[in-house]
Amino acid sequence: MPKKAEAKTGSSSKTTKRTVAKKDVKAEVNETNKTAEKVSSKKVNKTANSVDTNESSSNSTPSTGSKFELSSFKEKVAEIENNILQKIKENPTITGKPFRKLVSVNKLMETGAHIGLTTRKWNPKMKKFIYTKKGNNHIIDLLHTVISLNVAYNFLLDLVKANSNSESSPVLIVGTRGKTIKNHVKEQAKRSHAFYINERWLGGTLTNFSTITKSVAKFNNLILIHKNGEINKYTKKEQVELKKKTEKYAKYFSGIRTMKELPKVIILTDPEINKIAIKEARNLGIPVIAICNTNANPDLVDYVIPANNHSIKSVYLLVGLLCDAVAEAKGLPKAFAEKKDEEILLPEVIKRKPENRRQNNHSFNKN
């Protein structure tokens, strides 16, 4: 056997020997995950697998050069969706409450939610959420995504309703990756009257909340100085300094200006780049909902939503759905949940061409 083949078989045997660690979370989440595992252990269909694998290579909906024609692709997606819904129908208690079709499988696949990271980056603890492997990527089992999304949605719905008399919103949304996601987190949090952090997480935001509150009070005071014209009393040099200070505070505290108490839950778009936030939440017993890619550690998250969190469209859709739960609990209109596919508008993602990335390297060329 060639050396490369030996290396591959050796690494794969080591991987299969690893055991998936079990996490201690709430009883209802444990029960849901166990039931979901039993249901998903039955493979969907060979045809369903072929659609997933073709999808992974393009990282989006199939292009004109894909193996399936568009009509055929839609038929395959419909077949996958029917299989998933049938499995849920056979296990009505799988989501803890009556199942709600929040979004179609077709829309999830359109966003690339099922496409995991490359296999070398995976965390073995995410094995139960993975459907198969295609090429260099893992494919996420959308059955788990649909079920987990329902469980998280119901949890948020009940939590916000239970805290309806509170002056402060119980939900804090954290999304710090990429300009589009940062802006979307801000928009959706404002729409659902939730708190948000879309810049770097400051250590101690939760565990040292009293100090953070003092900084927020200073920020609110600076805003007041600008609004009532009191800033004109200062010299030009002092005005410039105050403006810089205000902008610095605004960057980190704009989304939590009115947060008077600790949140009851935090929602993360990427647990891997916000590990400090997870650690603080766990220390204080605050539940964590997170969109987990195949590289995440699900043991650190209370409500895992397995999906591609490196895809702008995928995160855009899932954040919108979770914020709809908060909005619904407050009697506000929904923007994503239970809408038709054509009613859900996703951002246009423009990929830079390789030549554009290297346009500044011409200075090294010799004439």
UniProtKB/Swiss-Prot annotation:
Pfam families: Ribosomal_S2. One of its GO terms (biological process) is translation. Residues 53-66 have a biased composition (Low complexity). Residues 1-68 are annotated as: Disordered. Keywords: Ribonucleoprotein, Ribosomal protein. One of its GO terms (molecular function) is structural constituent of ribosome. GO terms for cellular component: cytosolic small ribosomal subunit. PROSITE patterns: RIBOSOMAL_S2_1, RIBOSOMAL_S2_2. Belongs to the universal ribosomal protein uS2 family. This is Small ribosomal subunit protein uS2. It comes from Malacoplasma penetrans (strain HF-2) (Mycoplasma penetrans). The gene is rpsB.
